């Protein structure tokens, strides 16, 4: 894992890179590199906003690309132990020596704020993640002698909003009420 962080006048940048080697994937497909970059700006400091109404305001963005490998023993066909002593069963899944790592590319944009002496806070973010080269089991014709094979197929996208808010209607030396 290699990373670097930089902060210049209320602007933050974080860059990382990581490479993994997986023993569950074949040589040539077993190494995957995943980088990420994120940045944020504290607008309330940058714009010198120092009022009782606005205490803190930050915008942020990030992008990452990560890999995923498969379960062990998916690359080669092997016999399974039988329920009978000393026996073996034929495999029910056809192995795939050419499996590649899954890939997930994601990004997020967000805003965080605190207002009225931090009595009202919020955090809103939009995220988007796309997974490609999913490692999935697909059915095959039974005449092949197996039921399934493991392949890289499919693409799925997951996106949405994350919202959190807190209000503190009562705060004094004896009581603090958060909602």
Where are these regions (language model features)?
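Extracellular/periplasmic, surface-exposed regions of secreted and cell-surface proteins
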Residues: 4-5, 9-179
């Amino acid at each position: 894992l290699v990373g670097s962080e930089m902060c210049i006048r209320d602007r933050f940048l974080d860059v990382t890179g990581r490479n993994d080697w997986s023993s569950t994937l074949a040589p040539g497909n077993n190494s995957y590199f995943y980088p990420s970059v994120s940045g944020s700006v504290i607008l309330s400091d940058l714009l010198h906003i120092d009022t009782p109404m606005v205490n803190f305001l930050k915008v942020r963005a990030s992008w990452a690309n990560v890999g995923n490998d498969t379960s062990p023993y998916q690359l080669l066909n092997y016999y399974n132990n039988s329920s009978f002593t000393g026996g073996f069963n034929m495999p029910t899944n056809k192995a795939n020596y050419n499996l590649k790592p899954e890939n997930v590319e994601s990004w997020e944009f967000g805003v965080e704020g605190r207002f009225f002496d931090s009595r009202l806070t919020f955090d809103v973010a939009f995220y988007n993640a796309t997974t490609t080269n999913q490692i999935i089991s697909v059915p095959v014709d039974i005449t092949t002698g197996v039921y399934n094979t493991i392949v890289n197929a499919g693409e799925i996208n997951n996106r949405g909003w994350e919202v959190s808010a807190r209000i503190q209607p009562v705060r004094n030396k004896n009581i603090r009420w958060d909602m």
